[in-house]
Amino acid sequence: MYLARTRFLFFLASLACASIIGTAFYLQQTFGLDPCFLCLIQRAAIIACGVLALCAACHAPGPTGMRRYSLGFLLIALTGLVTAGAQVWLQTASADQLIPFITKLEHLLSLLSLDMCIDRLRSDAMFCAEITWTLFGISLPEWSLLAFTGLALLPLYPLFSEFSHWLATKDRARY
């Protein structure tokens, strides 16, 4: 029964991801909101979460496979969560906080021989720091942060319920 519930949750997650991407494209076309570099990473994470959730729902693996799908989903959702959190921080940080951050990031990219990324970083970091649109006083990166938080919580159910099944089996084996 638990695997059927998990498949249904992953199917709902894939629908949620599809609606999030649809909304992002709608806002881009309707309001002319061009995505910045961090927005594109978040979109890629949402698409990856949606595809992985749909695969988990359609594949119907056993407990080990569902655990693997859940861990992969959790890693992708946490990547999006960190990216959205970084963008929210960029939007709320003052110029005094942004300049040292960008300087350290430029230094890191120069150490990695990614000089072509430095010029793009200067323009994109400032572009990502702009608040271009809000709904109920919440900016788009904050909405993304909320969505990724929900998506990161979803795979915890199969992981913890599998852990509780394992503990129950261990207790029964003792007696």
Swiss-Prot record:
Transmembrane segments annotated in the record for this chain: 10-26, 45-61, 69-85, 143-161
Cellular compartment(s): Cell inner membrane
GO cellular component, one term: plasma membrane
Entries under Pfam families matching the protein: DsbB
MF (Gene Ontology): electron transfer activity; protein-disulfide reductase activity
Covalent S-S links between cysteines: C36-C39
Cytoplasmic side: 1-9, 62-68, 162-175
Periplasmic membrane side: 27-44, 86-142
Protein family (similarity comment): Belongs to the DsbB family.
Name by which UniProt lists this protein: Disulfide bond formation protein B 2
Organism name: Pseudomonas savastanoi pv. phaseolicola (strain 1448A / Race 6)
Gene behind the chain: dsbB2
